[in-house]
């Protein structure tokens, strides 16, 4: 995702922080069954 990479680059360049954010969700219907793994995680990691 360009947006995620942009944010990551911004934090890394300005504050030296690596931030990751991934989102996921699951959809289950009667007609068509399809699941989209979707996890929400935001963990800023300070560089050492």
Swiss-Prot record:
This is Uncharacterized protein TP_0314.
């Amino acid at each position: 995702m360009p947006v995620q990479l942009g944010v990551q680059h911004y934090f890394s360049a300005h504050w030296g922080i690596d931030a990751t954010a991934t989102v996921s969700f699951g959809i289950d219907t009667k007609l068509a069954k399809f699941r989209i793994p979707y996890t929400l995680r935001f963990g800023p990691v300070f560089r050492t």
